[in-house]
């Protein structure tokens, strides 16, 4: 059974994905997501923080992610890009959530929506990103 927080992360990634693909305004995307049947089981506050925070800071987040990529950013699968941007926001703006939790949640969301091995790629990038964004947080190993 998915937690309300997992559903919020999934819905935030879907919203970021829609913004990347459709170039629709964030308020319209959020309205459409809120009308989905799954939204009733989500943490609305977390969804709002993740989606709108990612939208506001996406350019900065892609600058942080770009040097860690093994390919051109334009070659990123849109789902992987949405997951990386959303997780980057959570790592940057939500220090109350331990980074291993953020990475694990991003992996699970990628397994749900992404390609076959997309979760491995996301894991590798987020491990490096977490070390840069949260250098003082205790290591999980």
From Swiss-Prot:
GO terms for molecular function: RNA binding. The keyword Transcription applies. It comes from Neisseria meningitidis serogroup B (strain ATCC BAA-335 / MC58). Involved in transcription antitermination. Required for transcription of ribosomal RNA (rRNA) genes. Binds specifically to the boxA antiterminator sequence of the ribosomal RNA (rrn) operons. The lineage of its organism: Bacteria, Pseudomonadati, Pseudomonadota, Betaproteobacteria, Neisseriales. Gene3D superfamilies: NusB-like. It comes from the Bacteria. NCBIfam families: nusB (TIGR01951). HAMAP family: NusB. One of its GO terms (cellular component) is cytosol. It holds the Pfam family NusB. GO terms for biological process: DNA-templated transcription termination; transcription antitermination. The gene is nusB. Keywords: RNA-binding, Transcription, Transcription antitermination, Transcription regulation. Belongs to the NusB family. This is Transcription antitermination protein NusB.
